[in-house]
A protein has these predicted regions:
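M16/insulysin-pitrilysin zinc metalloprotease superfamily fold
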Residues: 81, 114-146
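Active-site SXXK
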Residues: 68-82
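Non-catalytic, conformational "gating/processing" segments within enzyme and secreted inhibitor domains
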Residues: 140, 147, 201-233
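Short pre-active-site segment immediately N-terminal to the catalytic Zn-binding motif
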Residues: 59-67
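Solvent-exposed, non-transmembrane alpha-helical starts
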Residues: 65, 121-124, 160, 228, ...
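Bacterial N-terminal signal peptides
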Residues: 6-15
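Non-catalytic beta-strand/loop surface segments
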Residues: 19-60, 84-119, 157-212, 236-281
Length: 293
């Protein structure tokens, strides 16, 4: 009994220490270039690495019906070379030991590099060059190549994957055809096939501009030096035409909706979906936790 009581008291002591621990505070500096690019700097010298992320405020919600999949297709095109480095984007950074990737959601597209801190300038140069000079190196061959890659990705992850089209059907059920959340980021095979070079160039000119992007640098670097590099590589980039944001109201579901569909799977699956709150809402974090249960 004494040993059990002692163990219980030890647990109380340990967990009490954890919960009274001081909160981690992340300091940052935020400013904006003349061309509208938002820059966020966070120094952390605990390891000799630096992370660069560029987030463009464009996603599949900015697409139009019959032109779906453009935002995700552009994620692929951004790794195909640009004005001053017309080659595989991964090559020089991976030779420096970098970790590189990008992702697309309905609301944003982001690209990042985690590099040894002495290669931070290289990462900034590469990001700035494709922000300002992607169209200078874009060709029909590159577009056709990446279009086929994205089509294969759709077949692999959606069409030929068990339950792969479930969320497409859910999106169509939750949102009307005119709403930008009606379709998924991958787009349809028909829309991807219909994408022309002019369509792709127009999408880039409209959304891939400094004033529609945020640049974040975090890790082992000197802020003064980083600011000089940011001005050097991003400061001279220009913006396109003003951006019109989608303004579709959130559809209200007045009653429960049910749907049954057959798929080539061995076991049935049930999906239960609720409309949630917008990003930044005070209840967002709590609902994210509930979602895990």
């Amino acid at each position: 009994m004494k040993s059990i009581l002692g163990f219980f008291m030890l647990l109380c002591l340990v967990f009490g220490t954890v919960y009274t621990k001081e909160q981690v505070r992340i300091t940052m500096k935020q400013y904006q270039l003349v061309n509208g690019l938002t820059v966020i700097l966070h120094e952390d010298h605990s390891a000799p690495i630096a992370s660069v992320m560029v987030m463009y405020h464009v996603g599949s919600k900015n697409e139009k019906p019959k032109r779906t999949g453009f935002a995700h297709l552009f994620e692929h095109m951004m790794f195909q070379g640009s004005k001053n480095y017309n080659d595989d984007y991964f090559k020089p950074l991976q030779e420096a030991g970098a970790n590189i990737n990008g992702s697309t959601t309905p609301d944003r597209t982001n690209y990042y590099e985690v590099v040894p801190s002495n290669f931070l300038e290289l990462a900034l140069f590469m990001e700035a060059d494709r922000m300002g000079g992607l169209l200078d190196a874009m060709t029909q061959e590159k577009l056709d190549n990446q279009r086929d890659v994205v089509k294969n990705e759709r077949r692999q992850r959606y069409d030929n994957q068990p339950y792969g089209t479930a969320f497409e059907k859910i999106s169509e059920l939750m949102y009307p055809k005119t709403h930008p959340y009606n379709w998924t980021t991958i787009g349809s095979l028909e829309d991807l096939s219909a994408a022309s070079m002019d369509d792709v160039k127009a999408f880039f000119r409209q959304y891939y501009s400094p004033s529609n992007a945020s640049l974040v640098i975090a890790g082992d670097f000197d802020s003064k030096q980083a600011k000089e590099w940011v001005t050097k590589y991003f400061g001279g980039l220009t913006n396109g035409a003003p951006i019109t944001r989608p303004s579709q109201p959130q559809p209200v579901l007045s009653q429960e909706i049910r749907m049954n569909y057959e798929d080539s799977v061995q076991l049935p699956r049930v999906y239960m979906v609720w409309q949630s709150v917008p990003q930044g809402n005070k209840d967002e974090a709590a609902l994210d936790v509930v979602d895990q249960f």
